[in-house]
Amino acid sequence: MPTKARIRLWSTNVENLNYVITQIRGIVEKTGIEMRGPIPLPTSKLEVPIMRLPHGEGRKKWEKWEMRVHKRLIDIAADERVMRQLMRVRVPEDVYIEIQLI
C-alpha cells in the first residue's frame, strides 16, 4: 500500500495557488499528518512575440506577451481520511492539481 502522496500544483495565478495550498495545509494540520512543502519549483515563462501592425507594412514593431506558470510540490503521508478531505477542496478554475501515490 502506498505510504506517501505527492501533490503537484500549477497555475498562472499565484494568489489562487497559495489559497489552495493554505487549504491543504489546514487539512493536514488538523489531522496531524507529516507534510513536506510546499516546495516552489521553477516558474516557466511562455513568451509569444506578435507584430503590432497586421498588414506588415511600415516599421516592424513587436509586442511581447508573456504567461508565467507557477508550480509547487507537496509531499504528505497517504492517509485515507486526508485523501478524502483533499478531494473535497474547492479549487479555482485556473489551478491544476495532480496527485500521485508513491
Swiss-Prot record:
<protein>
    <recommendedName>
        <fullName>Small ribosomal subunit protein uS10</fullName>
    </recommendedName>
</protein>
<keyword id="KW-0689">Ribosomal protein</keyword>
<comment type="similarity">
    <text>Belongs to the universal ribosomal protein uS10 family.</text>
</comment>
<dbReference type="GO" id="GO:0022627">
    <property type="term" value="C:cytosolic small ribosomal subunit"/>
</dbReference>
<dbReference type="GO" id="GO:0000049">
    <property type="term" value="F:tRNA binding"/>
</dbReference>
<keyword id="KW-0687">Ribonucleoprotein</keyword>
<dbReference type="InterPro" id="IPR001848">
    <property type="entry name" value="Ribosomal_uS10"/>
</dbReference>
<dbReference type="InterPro" id="IPR036838">
    <property type="entry name" value="Ribosomal_uS10_dom_sf"/>
</dbReference>
<comment type="function">
    <text>Involved in the binding of tRNA to the ribosomes.</text>
</comment>
<dbReference type="GO" id="GO:0006412">
    <property type="term" value="P:translation"/>
</dbReference>
<dbReference type="Pfam" id="PF00338">
    <property type="entry name" value="Ribosomal_S10"/>
</dbReference>
<dbReference type="GO" id="GO:0003735">
    <property type="term" value="F:structural constituent of ribosome"/>
</dbReference>
<comment type="subunit">
    <text>Part of the 30S ribosomal subunit.</text>
</comment>
<dbReference type="InterPro" id="IPR018268">
    <property type="entry name" value="Ribosomal_uS10_CS"/>
</dbReference>
<dbReference type="InterPro" id="IPR005729">
    <property type="entry name" value="Ribosomal_uS10_euk/arc"/>
</dbReference>
<dbReference type="InterPro" id="IPR027486">
    <property type="entry name" value="Ribosomal_uS10_dom"/>
</dbReference>
